[in-house]
């Protein structure tokens, strides 16, 4: 769990 983890997960969810 780092800070960018949330942003990366969102990028994977919606292109």
UniProtKB/Swiss-Prot annotation:
Tissue specificity, in the record's words, reads: Expressed by the venom gland.
Chief location of this protein within or outside the cell: secreted
Keyword annotations for this protein, in alphabetical order, are:
Antibiotic, Antimicrobial, Disulfide bond, Secreted, Toxin
Question: Where in the cell does this protein reside?
Answer: Secreted
Q: How is it modified after translation?
A: Contains 3 disulfide bonds.
Q: Name one GO molecular function term.
A: toxin activity
Gene Ontology CC terms: extracellular region
Its BP terms in the Gene Ontology are: defense response to bacterium
Q: What does this protein do?
A: Has antimicrobial activity against S.aureus (78% growth inhibition at 1.8 uM).
The UniProt family comment states: Belongs to the long chain scorpion toxin family. Class 3 subfamily.
The protein's name:
Scorpine-like
């Amino acid at each position: 769990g780092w800070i960018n983890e949330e942003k990366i997960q969102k990028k994977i969810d919606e292109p």
